[in-house]
Amino acid sequence: MVRLHNRKEIAQRFADAIKSEYIKQIILFGSVARGDDTENSDIDILIISDEYDKIKDFVADEVIKVIFDDKEYISAQIMNTAHYNKTKNFSFLTNVQKEGVILG
């Protein structure tokens, strides 16, 4: 299968689509951010927002658009700022900070 867009471009388009006053930061992480993704890799996105209820449905709709339009899967995780700051020294978030690419 020939991919029309690379996954980093898809991630940036997704981030541009979901940017709003309710989202503080959007971070691409994982294999796509590192550049070692494979055919079966998904696109890992961490969204920092204190307004989960206001963005969850819209984010889910945009994930579905990417699945249909680009035939790629986005794994979008929403985390509030307090939880992010409290757990940023844990291994998961340490890796996100080390390898992550800020998209918005």
Model-derived features: where do they sit?
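Short beta-strand->loop micro-motif that forms the acidic, two-metal-ion catalytic signature
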Residues: 44-48
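Catalytic core of pol beta-like nucleotidyltransferases
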Residues: 1-27, 33-39, 49-104
